[in-house]
Amino acid sequence: MGKKLLSIIIPCYNEEKTVETIYVAITDTMDMLPQYDYEILFVNDGSKDNTLNKLTGLSEMDVHVKYYSFSRNFGKEAAIYAGLNNARGDYVVIMDADMQDPPALLPEMISTLESGEYDSVATRRVSRKGEPMVRSFCARCFYKLIRRISDADIVDGARDFRMMTRDMVNSVLALSEYNRFSKGIFGWVGYRTKWLEYENIERTAGETKWSFWKLLAYSLDGIVNFSNVPL
């Protein structure tokens, strides 16, 4: 019987300063899990910097690395969907490129899914240390509102950093929403989820790509798509 495959999806937008760092951190972690095979799927979301060249170099150097590149910036949700659609793994995990999602959690996530008690291992921040106060306040207000008006299990402080079984990934892909809001979809499909908590980790390099207006549009997508209240 062959090794189980872990697919690691990493959306990237102008992350030339971080993609090599996250690659090294992931490979170091996976070297400690020789019983599993893995693929790293970078999705270049129309970056305007040197991200694509960095990804090309990594893929030429390491057969574990693949990349997909958009012609323009379609947004993180589109990149996540493209990654899920191309992932072949028995287990699939989504991570940010900026090292705010610690690869050191991967062994615990795999072990949890291997137990058979859960179909998903999700993560949430228990603090927003280092984040602008206005952004933290708006985020807390959004989560309070969405929990009041939606049946989807959307947890305050939830990250996109999540590992899922193949069955759950297939269920997520089966949903045909045009404007996708992954945090809501992951809760909506109803699989058993274990939550891991950790302190906020500031990005290692580069700048956040989430302006106030992008965050507002993202929040409105979540409210419109998952509200039980007539809008």
Question: Residue locations for each model-derived region?
Answer:
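Acceptor/aglycone-binding surface of glycosyltransferases and processive sugar-polymer synthases
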Residues: 57, 68-72, 76-86, 91, ...
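Structured catalytic core of nucleotide-sugar glycosyltransferases
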Residues: 1-131
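Residues at helix C-cap/C′ positions in short coil/turn segments immediately following an alpha-helix
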Residues: 34, 116-117, 150, 227-230
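Short, structured loop/turn "capping" segments at alpha-beta junctions
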Residues: 179-180, 192-197, 230-231
